[in-house]
């Protein structure tokens, strides 16, 4: 009698546990996969976000290039002034006209004696003490369409981050009166500038006052050394 009484609850407990397990399996549902429409919606949202962020990304890139150009321009002017301090004259003869091809100035300031491209410093003729006043890097790709942020070994010019050679202007008359390449009081200072050397970048559009760009500085994307 005692054995039967003890055994009955055990059998009932086992049956109850088995029933609970079976019931849990019956209520388990398989995971539903994404439908094609849902995937298309997600892709569309991602495309919209990229479209919104891309202009901001490009703006950040452009600003970084402008900042680099500004630093390069200041270094160019400082190098020209350092040359004047060392030699008592400027590195190249000029009549205050913009130097569109800056290779002559750069050869001299870099103490490069290369006999090429009409280098005025060939055989160290100008920078006789062979002092390196500026030492920018060479361009990573030396092709006409890809020159950026450095000196081209081919033509000797110093290119801005936008792929255009830097413009330089030197007070060749030694009268401390530099004609401003931009219209007076349009954001780039007064008419004549009381300064010995200036430099500027034509900016992203590649246009400066001397090659079809606007002379109103406020309406341009140019970068200048003196402001």
Task: Give the location of each predicted region.
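N-terminal leader/signal peptides at the extreme start of proteins
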Residues: 1-34
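N-terminal regions of proteins, emphasizing targeting and processing segments when present
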Residues: 9-10, 18, 41, 52, ...
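Residue-level recognition of conserved structural "scaffold" positions that shape functional pockets
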Residues: 14, 19-22, 58, 95, ...
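N-terminal single-pass transmembrane signal-anchor helix
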Residues: 30-60, 65, 69
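N-terminal pilin/flagellin-like segments and related low-complexity appendage regions
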Residues: 66, 70-227
